[in-house]
């Protein structure tokens, strides 16, 4: 019996060694197939959808998917030509991740842009920007937004929610550049667009691994394992 089990085990290991593996790759920015939204069923999924921001892009690229289900990541674009060259139209993707932080529910939303180019010759390949929506308790039917923190140049700025910067439960966010400074987020009073929402836990393991390990140059993935808590610390409002 032991000999049979050992033989079966060795055959299985040999089979595994012969199965071809597909390594994740860096691919063209417009070839990355984003994730479809999932039907929200958990408290965190429902809250992430409820408070999903609108994004108004005033200049530069619109959001693109950064990673696909197989873990392939976007190669981005060189900052050349028009600031929105080859990146002005796409369905896009918005990523989310939530947790309790200092007794407050934090929802981080993040967008990826293939390049950050204020004007030809300036900027860099890849851009990641994000916001943190601070909520009192996502379990409450009438959960309240306590503060909104938006990113820019490695820092976060907090603002209080009001009738001008919110549409119902959704923050109004702008993406823009004040020349010659690179792009950043701002609070807005204009309703922008939305993108398919995908949460960290709903990504495939390959996609999460890619976002944890891929070098996006001067841009950091704000919601991956190495940076998530660090960015929550920067975005804290009390």
What spans do the regions from the language model cover?
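Bacterial N-terminal signal peptides that target proteins for export
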Residues: 1-8
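Bacterial N-terminal signal peptides
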Residues: 10-17
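Sec/Tat signal peptide C-region and signal peptidase I cleavage site
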Residues: 18-24
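A domain-level signal for the mature, folded cores of soluble proteins
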Residues: 24-129, 140, 144-238
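Short beta-strand micro-motifs enriched in acidic
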Residues: 134-138
């Amino acid at each position: 019996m032991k000999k049979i089990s050992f033989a079966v085990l060795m055959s299985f290991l040999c089979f595994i060694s012969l199965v071809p593996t597909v390594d994740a790759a860096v691919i063209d920015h417009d070839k990355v197939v984003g994730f479809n939204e999932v039907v929200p069923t958990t408290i965190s999924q429902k809250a992430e959808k409820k408070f999903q921001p609108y994004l108004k892009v005033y200049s530069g690229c619109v959001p693109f998917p950064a990673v696909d289900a197989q873990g392939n990541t976007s190669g981005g674009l060189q900052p050349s030509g028009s600031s929105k060259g080859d990146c002005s139209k796409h369905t896009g993707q918005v990523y989310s991740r939530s947790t309790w932080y200092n007794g407050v529910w934090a929802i981080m939303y993040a967008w990826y842009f293939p390049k950050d180019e204020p004007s030809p010759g300036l900027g860099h390949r890849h851009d990641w920007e994000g916001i943190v929506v601070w909520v009192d308790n996502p379990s409450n039917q009438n959960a309240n937004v306590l503060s909104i923190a938006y990113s820019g140049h490695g820092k976060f700025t907090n603002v209080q929610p009001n009738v001008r910067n919110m549409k119902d439960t959704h923050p109004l966010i702008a993406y823009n550049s004040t020349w010659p400074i690179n792009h950043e987020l701002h609070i807005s009073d204009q309703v922008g667009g939305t993108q398919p929402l995908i949460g960290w836990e709903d990504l495939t393991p390959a996609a999460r691994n890619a976002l944890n390990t891929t070098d996006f140059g001067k841009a950091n993935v704000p919601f991956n394992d190495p940076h998530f808590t660090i960015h929550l610390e920067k975005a804290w409002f009390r």
